[in-house]
């Protein structure tokens, strides 16, 4: 199993020192990160940062980390640089602005998701990410439902790959 504390689930009474054993055993850490967009309880923001930094502080285990960045992309990218862990970081469904992405060009991986066939901003972001740093994801069946009202199935990943290829003018074989 994969271990992480999603920013939507962060509470002020989390005893972070108790999680190191879980992190040690997990092949990947995530989804962790910050969300200053969907999380309306601003008092949790400092706790989110604390949990996020704690997850990065155990990088002595050299794990890949799946990171949620909604509404605080620049802060996240700066924290990733601070902890010098960008090669192990996967930025989940980046939707920040292109300038932040360019200014904070790092060696992270980024995911493209089910919105690529529908949202121009997402298409523009995907064009900015080097193909060798791009991964595809569906973010679960309800993500597509959020985008177009249709409940997504696992094979939706094929459409994500096709959209990545169309946007970047690539053949599917070039993504291997």
Feature map (PLM): residue ranges:
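Short beta->alpha connector loops
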Residues: 7-11, 70-73, 94-97, 114-118
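His/Asp/Glu-enriched short active-site or ligand-binding loop at hydrolase and phosphoryl-transfer sites
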Residues: 107-121
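Divalent metal-binding pocket/active-site signature
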Residues: 17-106, 124, 143-151, 155, ...
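Active-site neighborhood of phospho(di)ester-bond hydrolases with catalytic His/Asp-centered motifs
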Residues: 2-4, 29-30, 64-67, 90-91, ...
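His/Asp/Glu-enriched, well-ordered alpha-helical/loop segment
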Residues: 133-138, 144-176
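Conserved, mostly hydrophobic/aromatic
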Residues: 1, 31, 125-126, 139, ...
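A metal-dependent hydrolase metal-coordination microenvironment
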Residues: 1-18
């Amino acid at each position: 199993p994969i271990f992480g504390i999603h920013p939507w689930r962060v509470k002020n009474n989390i005893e972070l020192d108790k999680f190191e054993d879980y992190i040690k055993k997990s092949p990947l850490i995530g989804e962790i990160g910050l969300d200053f967009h969907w999380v309306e309880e601003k008092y949790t923001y400092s706790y989110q940062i604390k949990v996020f930094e704690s997850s990065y502080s155990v990088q002595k285990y050299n794990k890949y980390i799946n990171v949620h960045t909604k509404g605080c992309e620049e802060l996240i990218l700066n924290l990733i640089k601070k902890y010098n862990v960008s090669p192990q970081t996967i930025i989940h469904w980046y939707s920040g602005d292109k300038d932040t992405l360019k200014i904070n060009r790092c060696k992270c991986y980024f995911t493209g998701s089910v919105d690529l066939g529908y949202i121009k901003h997402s298409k523009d972001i995907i064009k900015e990410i080097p193909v060798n740093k791009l991964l595809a994801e569906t973010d679960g069946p309800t993500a597509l439902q959020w985008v177009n009202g249709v409940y997504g199935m696992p094979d939706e990943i094929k459409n994500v790959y096709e959209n990545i290829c169309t946007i970047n003018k690539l053949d599917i074989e070039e993504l291997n």
